[in-house]
């Protein structure tokens, strides 16, 4: 044989057998995280109950309407033929919950956040302004409700979905708020119960 690939592979004349690799058993040194990349606390996963899903709808609202049930912590986008898309949400904590009917008056991608004066009085540690981005508490999208300070927005704290934690805004997982944002328009009716 001519010393080709098969001979090398299967041990023909002139072949050289490779030695099996050796593995070191020395312990791997422990390193500290780089500055600014400290380990973050683990948070529980979002309950499957609060994941986006298609459900039946038997109410009286027209297709395209948003219904937010603050007790269930669920938002419904009413669709045709007795169907709805359901999303889990975080809602206002005790003393900050509200109900009523509004319209979406603005939509913003990666919105800036300026805490209102009332919030700054309660939380003077908050920044006075924060540019949009992954650290911004409004998340990836925001839909503004009427002339109020309330919004339906994303969150950089997805583990809070299904809880009463906000100052009255309706928060969603970022992937869900992006999905909803694409499905609604300015003028959409929002019913909060």
Summary of predicted features, one role per range:
Residues 1-54:
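Compositionally biased, proline/threonine/alanine/serine-rich low-complexity intrinsically disordered stretches
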Residues 167-181:
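Short beta-strand-centered segments at strand-helix junctions
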Residues 43-158, 179-186:
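Gly/Pro-biased beta-strand-loop elements
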């Amino acid at each position: 044989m001519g010393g080709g690939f098969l001979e090398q592979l299967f041990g023909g004349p002139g072949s050289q057998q490779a030695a099996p690799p050796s593995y070191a058993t020395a312990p791997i040194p422990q390193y500290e995280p780089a500055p600014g990349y400290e380990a973050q606390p683990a948070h529980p996963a979002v309950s499957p109950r609060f994941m986006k899903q298609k459900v039946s709808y038997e109410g009286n609202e027209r297709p395209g309407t948003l219904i937010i049930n603050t007790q269930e912590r669920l938002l419904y986008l009413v669709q045709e033929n007795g169907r709805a898309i359901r999303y889990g949400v975080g809602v206002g904590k005790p003393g900050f919950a509200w109900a009523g009917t509004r319209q979406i008056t603005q939509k913003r991608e990666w919105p800036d956040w300026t805490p209102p004066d009332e919030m700054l009085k309660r939380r003077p540690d908050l920044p006075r302004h924060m540019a949009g981005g992954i650290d911004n508490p409004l998340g990836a999208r925001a839909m503004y409700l009427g002339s109020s300070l309330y919004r339906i927005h994303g969150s950089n704290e997805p583990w809070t979905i299904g809880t009463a934690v906000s100052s009255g805004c309706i928060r969603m997982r970022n992937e869900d708020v992006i999905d909803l944002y694409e499905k609604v328009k300015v003028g959409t009716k929002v019913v909060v119960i």
